[in-house]
Amino acid sequence: RLVGSEMCIRDRTEMLSRYEVEMEHYSKIINIEALTMLEMARKQLLPAINAYMSEVANTAASKLAVSEHISVRSETKTLEKLSSDADAMSDAIDTLQDAVNAAKALPTESEKAVAFHDNVLPVMDALRAAADDAETICGEDYWPLPSYSKMLYYV
């Protein structure tokens, strides 16, 4: 038994084996989270943002059809911000997919775990930040996921 070990590890080989198993487990968890995030962003969030942007653009066009003197500043600002968020999400989706593929291609479990931690998690955070910002702008009826306020209210 190694000194200080609470898991009754008998020797260095067993310790390294357990380490590799833990690194593999970590990598698999982050991989699943990243793939889930990619699917949600591609199939739910970006389409919702685009649908809401279309609605806002149609509203602006309708207002301008009535009179060129009607302001569409609010709609323009909303479209600019959502477009920026959608672009950031799209870029993060591409970067995240590349980072996941690169991490999965590494030869050892410890290298994969480090790559998932150092390269995948930061891109997941960036994608999340853009999606969180878009959520605050999109109309409630368009957003496909429960909002933070609804989740807190119903807890």
Regions found by a protein language model. Give the residues of each.
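Leucine-rich amphipathic alpha-helices with coiled-coil/heptad-repeat character
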Residues: V56, K63, I93, V100, ...
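Short, small-residue-biased leader/transition segments that mark boundaries at the very start
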Residues: L2-C8
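Extended, well-ordered alpha-helical scaffold/bundle regions in very large, multi-domain proteins
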Residues: A65-A105
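Long amphipathic alpha-helical coiled-coil segments
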Residues: N101-F116, G139-Y154
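C-terminal structured domains
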Residues: S62-E75, E80, L121, D141-V155
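C-terminal catalytic subdomain
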Residues: R12-L79
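A structural signal for alpha-helical segments
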Residues: E33, M40, I70-K77, S84, ...
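Charged, amphipathic alpha-helical oligomerization/scaffolding segments
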Residues: M40, Q44-A51, E55, K81-T95, ...
